[in-house]
């Protein structure tokens, strides 16, 4: 069996939560390796909905779950989400949940800064969740972050807070916002220290020991590769690296420990927030996909923008992430359409290209080139075998495989975990 990385190949919301939940039965350990509580997902287990945004999906199944060093942790949200799951009957104890001691913390001042920028102060509206993710990563890179381990060292914490506030209070003065008192921030952290410290661990050592014992690890990505800070639609991206390579740097496991990369893609495309979206359908088709697919954000409730499947973008992320197989989700949303379009290339300034350029200007000018396929009337919803699928749906899947350059390894035909068709087992490689 192998260690598997799960990564979104679009702009997030691809259905990673269900796929991770389905794969978790084959894994011993589930690891979150980037992002924060800005990207949520819903698990449906025995008819019960579990909404997660920070905690790893494996907790619902009682699996050892790790929040890696690549994640920014809001300690107050951690406490809230922990309580919510416990209230739903999920047993969460330190034996099955560990948090990297060197994971940076999201503080109230990060949320403040995020909200101020999104209000238009910065002159660029990205469409963030205003949860402080970006500012927390800025402090990490700026070498001034407060990390989980700092909560255990109260005697040195105040000095670190004062160093952090020298930066943030200067920003706040410039924006005309009241400065933060160091003692108030210290008290804020001490209020949650006892809640989070029992889960703290040197997680890279735990993972290394587990790997040497033959344990199988599932790396759970958040958001999607098209939101990657380097390879996404910059500047309309998130503040972390969301590509598969981040599984190593965000967990402390080396590249040699990764054996299979499973990309997740919807059978169409969605996006939340601002930024380019070549195949967006601002028409009846877009409305149909949004309503049928229940396309509203788990964290924010925002309506998602919807469009046709963009094979150019998915192929690009398949290449960058080293994807060996795709889990194709929400095929059932397309049931009943007379015809289905797939973007197979772009036109940019009169020339055909087969990739999305990096510049914002070029991204805004690309025009999608479509191929039109026949739709299907027979339902794919709740199909459990390949043989249950309509012929035209199979043709659609095969065409996508041809365009993106990799196989469909799993097929999801409803939000229920049981409605999954396994074609190639990622853990068997």
From Swiss-Prot:
GO terms for cellular component: cytoplasm. GO terms for molecular function: adenylosuccinate synthase activity; GTP binding; magnesium ion binding. Its cofactor is Mg(2+). Keywords: Cytoplasm, GTP-binding, Ligase, Magnesium, Metal-binding, Nucleotide-binding, Purine biosynthesis. It catalyses: IMP + L-aspartate + GTP = N(6)-(1,2-dicarboxyethyl)-AMP + GDP + phosphate + 2 H(+). The keyword Magnesium applies. The keyword Isomerase does not apply. It comes from the Bacteria. SMART domains: Adenylsucc_synt. GTP binds at residues 12-18, 40-42, 304, 330-332, 412-414. SUPFAM superfamilies: P-loop containing nucleoside triphosphate hydrolases. InterPro entries: Adenylosuccin_syn_GTP-bd (IPR018220), Adenylosuccin_syn_Lys_AS (IPR033128), Adenylosuccinate_synth_dom1 (IPR042109), Adenylosuccinate_synth_dom2 (IPR042110), Adenylosuccinate_synth_dom3 (IPR042111), Adenylosuccinate_synthetase (IPR001114), P-loop_NTPase (IPR027417). Mg(2+) binds at residues 13, 40. Its main location: cytoplasm. Belongs to the adenylosuccinate synthetase family. This is Adenylosuccinate synthetase.
């Amino acid at each position: 069996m192998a260690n598997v990385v799960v990564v979104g190949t679009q702009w997030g919301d691809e259905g990673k939560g269900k796929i991770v939940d389905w794969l978790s039965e084959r894994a011993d350990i589930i690891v979150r390796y980037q992002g924060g509580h800005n990207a949520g997902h819903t698990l449906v287990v025995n008819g019960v909905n579990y909404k997660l945004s920070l905690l790893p999906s494996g907790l619902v199944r009682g699996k050892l779950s790790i929040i890696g060093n690549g994640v920014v942790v809001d300690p107050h949200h951690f406490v809230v989400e922990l309580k919510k799951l416990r209230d739903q009957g999920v047993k969460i104890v330190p034996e099955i949940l560990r948090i990297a001691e060197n994971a940076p913390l999201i503080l109230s001042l990060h949320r403040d800064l995020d909200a101020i920028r999104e209000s238009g102060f910065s002159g660029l509206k990205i469409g963030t969740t205003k949860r402080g993710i970006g500012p927390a990563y800025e402090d990490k890179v700026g070498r001034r972050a407060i990390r989980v381990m700092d909560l255990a060292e109260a005697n040195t914490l105040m000095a670190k807070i004062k160093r952090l506030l020298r930066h943030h209070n200067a920003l706040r003065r410039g924006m005309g916002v009241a400065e933060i008192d160091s003692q108030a921030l210290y008290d804020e952290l001490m209020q949650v220290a006892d809640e989070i410290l029992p889960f703290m661990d040197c997680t890279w050592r735990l993972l290394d020991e587990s790997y040497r014992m033959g344990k199988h690890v599932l790396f759970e990505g958040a958001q999607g590769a098209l939101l990657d800070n380097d390879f996404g639609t910059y500047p309309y991206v998130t503040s972390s690296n969301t590509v598969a390579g981040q599984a190593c740097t965000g967990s402390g496991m080396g590249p040699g420990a990764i054996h299979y990369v499973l990309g997740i893609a919807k059978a169409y495309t969605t996006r939340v927030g601002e930024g380019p979206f070549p195949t967006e359908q601002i028409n009846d088709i877009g409305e149909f996909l949004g309503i049928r697919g229940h396309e509203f954000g788990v964290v924010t409730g925002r309506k998602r923008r919807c469009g046709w499947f963009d094979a150019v973008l998915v192929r690009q992320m398949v290449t960058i992430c080293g994807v060996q197989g795709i889990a194709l989700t929400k095929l059932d949303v397309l049931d009943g359409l007379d015809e289905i379009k797939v973007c197979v290339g772009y036109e940019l300034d009169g020339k055909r290209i087969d990739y999305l350029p990096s510049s914002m200007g070029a991204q805004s000018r690309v025009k999608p080139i479509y191929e039109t396929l026949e739709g299907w009337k027979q339902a794919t919803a709740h199909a459990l075998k390949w043989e249950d699928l309509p012929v035209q749906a199979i043709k659609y899947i095969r065409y996508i495989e041809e365009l993106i350059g990799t196989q469909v390894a799993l097929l999801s035909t409803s939000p229920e975990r049981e409605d999954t068709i396994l074609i190639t087992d990622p853990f068997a490689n």
